[in-house]
Amino acid sequence: MMDEAITAFLTKHHLLTLCTCKANIPYAASCFYAFMKESATFVIATDVTKTRHGLEAVENEHVAGSVALETKMVGKIQGVQFTGRFREANEAEKKAYLKRFPYAIAMSPELWSIEIQYLKFTNNTLGFGKKLEFFASN
């Protein structure tokens, strides 16, 4: 089970950096996300036939990324780094994304999910360098 401090942080934010890799060449893209607490999953919208990160994630499902609070105050630094598996979103995940971003309904986006396999949360509000980790059970 993911620590409540991590889920609270991820629920509060909405933009992640998705990192993919093809032929040992990394790539990063910013994506809006909805977070599924129960399944430790991010849901994003991307066209896997047109975007570089989408094309690469379909070819190599192993992805990584981050979500960070932008601050200059060291004592307030918070953020996660994660690895996960990219896959098609299920119906519950699609509903969650469209609830979080209702204006996206008009665009009929392709929705995809990232099942978090490992996550490290840095939270300096709990003490300098305080880190919490999550490991998927499968």
Where do the PLM segments sit?
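A short, Trp-centered hydrophobic/proline-enriched beta-strand micro-motif
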Residues: 8-23, 63-67
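Charged, gly/pro-rich active-site loop segments
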Residues: 74-138
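A generic structural signal for short beta-strands and their flanking turns/coil linkers
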Residues: 12-16, 29, 38-40, 59-63, ...
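Hydrophobic residues embedded in beta-strands of well-ordered beta-sheets
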Residues: 26, 40-42, 119
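Charged, amphipathic alpha-helical segments
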Residues: 1-4, 48-52, 95-97
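A short mixed-secondary-structure module that forms the rim of ligand-binding clefts
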Residues: 34-72
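A generic structural signal for nonpolar/aromatic side chains embedded in well-ordered alpha-helices
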Residues: 10, 55-57, 97
